[in-house]
Amino acid sequence: MRVLVTGGAGFIGSNIVETLVERGHEVIVLDNFFMGKKENLQEISDKIEFVEGSITDENLINKITKDVDVICNQAAASSSPMFSLDGLRSAVNVNVDGFNIILKSAVENNVKRVVYASTSSIYGNNPPPLREDMKVIPPNFYAATKLMNEYSAALFSQNHGLETVGFRYMSIYGRHEEGKTIYANLVTQFLWMMQKGKRPIIYGDGKQTRDFVYSKDVARANLMAIESKKKLSGEVLNIGIGKATSLNQLIVLLNKALGEKIKPKYVRMPVKNYIKTQRADIKKTKKVLHFSAKYSLEEGLKDILKN
């Protein structure tokens, strides 16, 4: 199968590309290196076709989606702080206009399916377990653009017969996060600090929870959606492990994995609309894709440190 992965040199994208190559698929990678890094793909650089560019370049997207079976869209302004007043216009342009260009080109070039990244941020502070049929009110511009993606995908499925499946990613950690720097997952940020003997900084009391899911599991979910024989029209699915871990518990697990006894530093919460709890309901994902995560948080940490 010939698959285009946008944002394929980034954190999640590169994990997906590695999995697709291992599976024997023909992969085209598109990335503009805003946060992606060539180093993320160096081990498989001779097994992929690479195109440097942005999903906002309509002529380029129309050109490279010819003879493609599936598009896996991971390109995005992928963190709420990127949507400051100064960056708002360009971030929305990438997430909304860029994604619509992907969908339009897919229809025009007879691409069978678009698999794309949405976000659990859409749920805001809805009480867990978070279900795909919940009423959602996005708490920030980032989440709003991702909800718009879901609406656009559903309309392209309804009006043009394009198969689409969006993943509401929970809190992803794993390999290849270096390019995300300050936008990296809390697991990775805490790990980086503790490996240097520094105290990780926790906003608030540390009782806030996240559904931490390992990047290898996320890549496998994308692979399953790409390869699925089912008709996936306008689907939206949670990707998590279905278990909540507090930041205090995370520190305990990191200390155990590192053989350390480093205490966190607690500071006042400066973030408005901060998400306090997160745990996915994964029943629909199991039913539609037959997917469930293989890695617990402890197992994921061991795998990262092993590599």
Can you describe what each PLM-predicted range is?
Residues 1-170:
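N-terminal Rossmann-like NAD(P)+-binding domain of SDR-like oxidoreductases, especially those catalyzing
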Residues 16, 222-226, 254, 301-305:
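Hydrophobic "lid"/C-terminal helical patch
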